[in-house]
Amino acid sequence: MKQFVKRFICGVLLVTTVCAVAGCYKDEAKTVAEERTPTSFRAIAATNASVEDKADLMVKNMSREDKIGQLILMGLDGTTLDEPQKEMMRKYRVGGILLDNNNMESKEQLRAFTKGIRDNANIASLAPPFIAIHRERMPYRPNVMIPWVEPNIISKKGLDAVGSLATRTSIEMRDLGFNLNLGPMVNTHSFYSYTQDLDRAAQIGELITKRYAVNQVFTAYQFFPCGADFTVPGMRVDVSKDALMDDDTRVFVQLIQSTAQERPMIMVNSVKVTSMDAKNPVSLSKPIITDWLRGELGFTGVGLSADIGYGATIT
């Protein structure tokens, strides 16, 4: 339980810090109960409105606590959803859950676990939660999931092989109750890269995202603006913006354009790109996230930070 609370507090700290630095709290009138339509998220989802109108209505219907909770993606302990964890989700209006190998025993157990997460959200009138996993980095667990072939190996087998694996794993994820994959890795200099070719990396990222979208599973490209050893808190990347645009960032530019309809997320790195922001890691950098990724490159989707344990909030 102590470890669970620690992981949750880390998530809250991450959200609070990112919002404060990136300026996502704007000078606008506070939302009060009388201004919100007292309609449940399930009722909104059942209407005949367009997806965009449903989303707008859901946001309008949210309290400030709901909106902050939507920014939290937290981990859980154990293989069942116990009462303290349910209460934590309800109290802080948590918008997403990240499961890992330690949460999994079997397909039946995992289906029950993810169903419990959804049911808890429904009971508390929460927005449908993201239930996520690092699919590409799951250890070999044949009793739980299809093994993911090493990226550099599957890439050499061709795009058909990549597409087939993406289709099978996305169907499996959907059936197990997941709706978000924290991947694919689209950097070209990582030990987990599919390829060192920029255009090929963009092709693979696009293919995986489109196959996952068919099965109602979102993806989150890793890691903007470049690959680096993000496990080292405070690591610096001394490279110019132009050099990045000729390297991994070019992959993101292509993917932002080619998969806009699928609405993938982008995971940002926690390293410091000193040429653009000498003080803050990418995950806290307004010049990099707001001005560059959103302003210049036109990304309008959801941005995710790296784990707080990897220095996502260390300046």
Where do the model's predicted regions map?
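Bacterial N-terminal signal peptides that target proteins for export
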Residues: 1-12
